[in-house]
Amino acid sequence: MPVLSKEDWAFWQENGYVVVHDAVPQQNLDAMVDVIWDFLQIDREDREAWYKYKPYSRDDRCSPISAAGMVEIYQHQALWDNRQYPRIHQAFSEIWGDEKLWVSLDRANMKPPAREDKPEWCNEGMIHWDKDTSQQPVSFGVQGVLYLTDTSEQQGGFQ
């Protein structure tokens, strides 16, 4: 059964991205959220604890989290449960026109809200491409972002 509707496919063709609603079950999302909090050893109910670490930098890589919120966790089963979930696989298969996919891995992200008293977390980021854009023409690539919690239009990792 296709994941992308005709409207989704037309949107993908026009805009270069598509939103797949309910891509994985809620229990997968909840499990991954738990894994992130556990990995960071942070009590999610203690909002001050969200700032427990200073983000790592090129000079100091002793923190498990970057200023952009990248959490240094790559191989946990909860990540793989989402990467390989059938609905995710099907969506990518439809875009690529092939069921033989190579699953790449990235990590999780958790960035606490910016606060004036925590300037190290006020990083507004930059436009980042996971491609070498100096090579012309730029080769085709597809990447997925899975939001684990509700996110307003004013939040998130896209500019």
Regions found by a protein language model. Name each.
Residues 19, 126, 143, 147, ...:
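Conserved beta-strand segments that form the floor/walls of ligand-binding pockets within enzyme
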Residues 1-14, 21-136:
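Non-heme Fe(II)-dependent double-stranded beta-helix
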Residues 134-153:
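Short, conserved beta-strand element in jelly-roll/cupin
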Residues 17, 100, 141, 157:
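A residue-level signal for beta-strand positions that form part of recognition/binding surfaces
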Residues 153-159:
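A short beta-strand-loop-beta hairpin characteristic of the jelly-roll/cupin
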